[in-house]
Amino acid sequence: MKVIKTLSIINFFIFVTFNIKNGSKYSNTFINNAYNMSIRRSMANEGSNTKSVGANAPKADTIASGSQSSTNSASTSTTNNGESQTTTPTAADTPTATESNSRSPPITTTESNSRSPPITTTESNSRSPPITTTESNSRSPPITTTESNSRSPPITTTESSSSGNAPNKTDGKGEESEKQNELNESTEEGPKAPQEPQTAENENPAAPENKGTGQHGHMHGSRNNHPQNTSDSQKECTDGNKENCGAATSLLNNSSNIASINKFVVLISATLVLSFAIFI
């Protein structure tokens, strides 16, 4: 901005000096400059007004000479009329000076301050902020939350309910409600008794798997857990510790997220350096 302003000011003064010294010889070289077009118009208007004043001045002398010749040819009584004629052209030439002063001032100082400011301030501030905020915050959260919570619950439910609750879960909720309504119509107290040992059976098989005191419980736990104990996180999920389920997967996801965040930081820093180098 400072360089552009200084160059425009220097160009303005150079153009004024050439017009003062050489007239209109160098006027064709500054046609493309917008700042100098207004100055040319003002100088052209002033030059035309001064030429009109110079052209009208000798005409007044000719009118005065003509009036004197008419007075000399007519008689001595017409001298008063001749003098009145000599005074009238000087009064008629005076309005030309007023017209030359009324056109020049409002043209020179309008175009120089209206074009430069709106170009530099709009482009530098609009490109950098939307890159940093949108991409970095939209990719990291859905990776960690969805995968860790979606894999652990189906492992625990299928193993514990494989003994007695499998046929109840395969049927839909509407079929269970229809069966319960039919049983309630036939006997009100009958279905309550077999449901309680089923819940007890669901609670009892989890105990030998966790403790491992008897041989039968130990073998049963080893058969069920041998193909699934490939990592420590799945052991903790089968034991019932839901807090530690998916810990290894979350660590891997965090490492991938850290790598992606580092890439975004490098890209953002590169764009900022390029923007500063271009605009500064």
From Swiss-Prot:
Keywords: Cell membrane, Disulfide bond, Glycoprotein, GPI-anchor, Lipoprotein, Malaria, Membrane, Merozoite, Repeat, Signal
Glycan-bearing residues: N22, N36, N168, N184, N229, N253, N254
Bias (Basic and acidic residues) ranges: 170-182, 233-242
GO CC annotation terms, alphabetical: plasma membrane; side of membrane
Residues that make up the propeptide removed upon maturation: 255-280
Signal peptide positions on this chain: 1-20
Disulfide bonding pattern of the chain: C237-C245
Membrane topology of the entry: Lipid-anchor; GPI-anchor
Tagged with keyword Nucleotide-binding: no
Lipid attachment in record (GPI-anchor amidated asparagine): N254
Positions with biased composition (Polar residues): 99-149
Segments annotated as Sequence repeats: 105-116, 117-128, 129-140, 141-152, 153-160
Compartments where located: Cell membrane
Disulfide bond listed as a keyword: yes
Pfam families listed in its UniProt record: MSA_2
GO biological process: cell adhesion
Chief location bin: membrane
Segments of skewed composition (Low complexity): 64-98, 150-163
Known function: May play a role in the merozoite attachment to the erythrocyte.
Protein name: Merozoite surface protein 2
